[in-house]
Structure formats: structure tokens, C-alpha cells
A protein has these predicted regions:
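Conserved, well-structured functional cores that handle cations and Mg-NTP chemistry
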Residues: 1-169
């Protein structure tokens, strides 16, 4: 039996969804699998309009899918175990990345450090948390979290700063 790469990918995503502890509806699983395949095959930027255009589902279905709670860490841990096996030598990687963004209504837009530009720039920052398999010298992302702006941190308390937020994540 000759299986394509997309068939193998669909099977892997299905197995990962089965490993999630929460009971998921069949409609959610179907839409989620379709979403993961779209991420692999969309030729341009990925947004809800493009997803609706390149699939047999509507744009609204994908919007609703993103409004639902989902345990990404458990899903990604399953994929990590599939990829790395049960090797013992692992480490946690944390990386904050600057994303250029303009606009006045974007949540948490602020001034963040850009390592490429070696300066503070206005935009967004995303904190990536991954697991490194030391033996295979490979890393897999577990979670990404948008870094809050200065105003949010000030609301949390006088002594609360960005390092405290990183530790809370």
C-alpha cells in the first residue's frame, strides 16, 4: 500500500488527538485535521480567508475552531514523544522573538528587544518554549505565548516585571 506524506501526516495528527485527555467531538477533530493539512499546503500567508478558499469548509468554521480551548501542550508532547522516542537526555529551550507590527488596536503592542536590529523596536514579542532532544540535536516547539506590553505588566503590581511574567508562563 502506497501512502502519501499527507496521509501519514493525517494519521499522526489523528493519533495525537486521540492522546488528548479531553473528549473532542468528531466535528472538531475533522476540522482540526483539515486545518493541520492546510498549514502544510497553503502557498501564501495563512489566514481564515485563505483557509476557507482552499478547503471545502467555510471561513467561519475555522474562526470558531480557534475560539475553542485546546490543550496544545499535551498534543505537542505526544508529537514530541513520537519524534524523539523515550530518550532521557532532554532540555527545555525558551526563546523570545520580536515580530514587527504596526497598528493602534493590536493587543499587547509595545516596545521589545529585536536581536537582529540590536535595538528596542515597536511591535510584538512571542515567547517560544520547546523541548530539545540532546542526542538527536533537534528541538520541537511545545508552546508559544504572546508577551504582554508594559501597561499590562504595570497592572499586575509594582514589583511585577517581564522576567516574572516569563517565569509564570
Amino acid at each position: 500500500m502506497n501512502r502519501t506524506a499527507l496521509d501519514q501526516y493525517e494519521e499522526l495528527v489523528t493519533d495525537a488527538l486521540k492522546s488528548c485527555s479531553a473528549k473532542l467531538r468528531k466535528s472538531f477533530k475533522t476540522a482540526f485535521i483539515q486545518l493541520m493539512i492546510l498549514y502544510m499546503v497553503l502557498p501564501r500567508k495563512i489566514n481564515f480567508t485563505q483557509m476557507g478558499r482552499y478547503s471545502d469548509s467555510s471561513e467561519q468554521r475555522f474562526r470558531q475552531l480557534f475560539e475553542r480551548e485546546f490543550d496544545w501542550i499535551q498534543f505537542n508532547l505526544f508529537l514530541m514523544r513520537q519524534r524523539f522516542g523515550e530518550s532521557v537526555r532532554k532540555a527545555i529551550a525558551i526563546d523570545a522573538s520580536y515580530i514587527s507590527k504596526s497598528g493602534k488596536k493590536t493587543p499587547y503592542i509595545g516596545k521589545f528587544w529585536s536581536g537582529c536590529a540590536s535595538q528596542v523596536k515597536r511591535g510584538l514579542e512571542i515567547l517560544g518554549i520547546g523541548i530539545i532532544d540532546i542526542d538527536s540535536r533537534d528541538c520541537m516547539m511545545l508552546r508559544a505565548e504572546q508577551t504582554p506590553d508594559k501597561a499590562y505588566l504595570e497592572k499586575q503590581g509594582e514589583d511585577y516585571n517581564l522576567v516574572d511574567w516569563y517565569l509564570d508562563v
